[in-house]
Amino acid sequence: FEGYPFGSFITYITDRDRGIIIFASNLAEHTTNIKNNSKSCFTIFSITDTENKQDNARMSLIGDFNQVDNKRREELKTKLRNHLPESEMYLNLGDFNFYKMSITNIRWIGGFGKIGWLNNKDWLNKNIEWEPAEKEIIDHMNQDHSNSIISTLSAQHNIKDKNAKMTEVNIDGYYCQSDNK
């Protein structure tokens, strides 16, 4: 289907700067397409129980996917394992690589009639001052403020877990690990 875009479904992780990172096999159709033409549109959507699916929020990121330098491979494998434990079986296969999208345009739809283009300069943050201290931030939060993590998880996602722990910080907040989800 040369010259035609090809939609696909793939899991992803986000980089600290909000960049999208996928882990894909060289045999996959979407990897072949990335190598032939890196221009891509990556849509993230929220699935809710609303009757009118047009009321669901979604965002389309437009940009180019490029293979990530192998120097980051172990870091990204750990991150993928933490966020998507089901990916473990793929992590040691030799034909899988990480690809990161360089985002050029962002289309946000918050529901029917709530539509707009976002400025990618406002979306991406290349100067992450706290990055060298991420481990210390996480350790401090887990040791001294675990009640806040547990309360936030309960309030935002209705997940009750007294053992919830912060696992990663990003420019939007943080990720938690929970025994209950």
Regions found by a protein language model. Give the residues of each.
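An N-terminal domain-cap segment
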Residues: 1-35, 43
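Well-ordered beta-strand positions in beta-sheet-rich domains
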Residues: 7-9, 58-62, 117
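A generic structural motif
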Residues: 13-16, 69, 107, 170
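Short, structured beta-strand-loop surface elements
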Residues: 29-89, 93-96, 103-106
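C-terminal edge-of-domain segments
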Residues: 89-181
